[in-house]
Amino acid sequence: MERVIQETDNDAFSCKISAITKRYLPSSEQKKIGNYEHYEDIHLEFCKEIKSRSRRKYANITKACRHSLPVMNYGTYLRTVSIDLKLTQWLKNNLENPADKVQVINLGCGSDLRMMTFLASFPGVQWLDLDYKDVVTFKSTILRSNAKFRASLQIEGDLPEEPSSIENVITDRYQLLPCNVTDDEQLIPILKKYTDFSVPAVILTECVLCYLHESKASQLISTVTGLYKQGYWISYDPIGGSQTNDRFGSIMQDNLMESRQLSMPTLMVFNSEDKYKERFPGKSEIQTMWDYYQNHLEDSERQRLKTLQFLDEIEELQVIFSHYVICTTNWRI
């Protein structure tokens, strides 16, 4: 099951490269907040490193770029932009003074490269990426082997003669470590060693909770929110839909099982906006991607998106994006 879940990271990264090459990303609003001028270069550089290490992964990327449908690029755009902007706003609110410190903990980070932009933008940020060992080994090998990434993340030390022996990245402000985040015996010692429970923490779970069994997801939320005195959780996931005639969730489950033998155990448990946000403590806010598209994007940005690829089925966007949510939670002990 772990291996199958890890494959979804390659899908997500492939979709992001497609959205970047077709100019969906970065968005106009991302460009306004700064430090996105190297966004494309960072991702294409990482993609080049993938090509030299895994033909299969690179083939998936090129296939996604050749055959990506507008709805997929819109989805990647909304997913990426909504998370980035909510994270940016929270960091700005909590880093008003030069001495302020916060930490970002990305649970199930995969190939996500957000840390490059945010570490450059916010000197008061510490960043911790966690994922399964195989994912971390592959990502850390690229980060530690590439001169541009080493300079950006201030990675020191010689590269091991055997790249496969690289299992982490540890610098003053950035750590990438292997961890099964659903195992408290692995997770808690890492958080104790590399984070400060008295410092405000942002927790990112991007399409992570949906792949966990309900008990494991609840345990993860309870463990993490119980450790930090103040925190902000950003979670992005699909929801199955709660209306009687809504078959989105069941169709999605059938397709995943048929194509990958993969399940989303809580897709139909937390199948509505209200049910999804109730799983978190503290004050939570939730928004579907359709609502985000309709009410958050400026008219000029929606018009820009329409010029990138021909899209004739706006109703399809509404159906799909009404079943993806971004949920944010503030808590304080």
UniProtKB/Swiss-Prot annotation:
Keywords: Methyltransferase, S-adenosyl-L-methionine, Transferase. InterPro entries: LCMT1, Ppm1/Ppm2/Tcmp, SAM-dependent_MTases_sf. It comes from the Eukaryota. The keyword Mitochondrion does not apply. Methylates the carboxyl group of the C-terminal leucine residue of protein phosphatase 2A catalytic subunits to form alpha-leucine ester residues. One of its GO terms (biological process) is methylation. Its EC number is 2.1.1.233. This is Leucine carboxyl methyltransferase 1. It catalyses: [phosphatase 2A protein]-C-terminal L-leucine + S-adenosyl-L-methionine = [phosphatase 2A protein]-C-terminal L-leucine methyl ester + S-adenosyl-L-homocysteine. GO terms for molecular function: protein C-terminal leucine carboxyl O-methyltransferase activity. Belongs to the methyltransferase superfamily. LCMT family. It is an enzyme of class 2 (transferase).
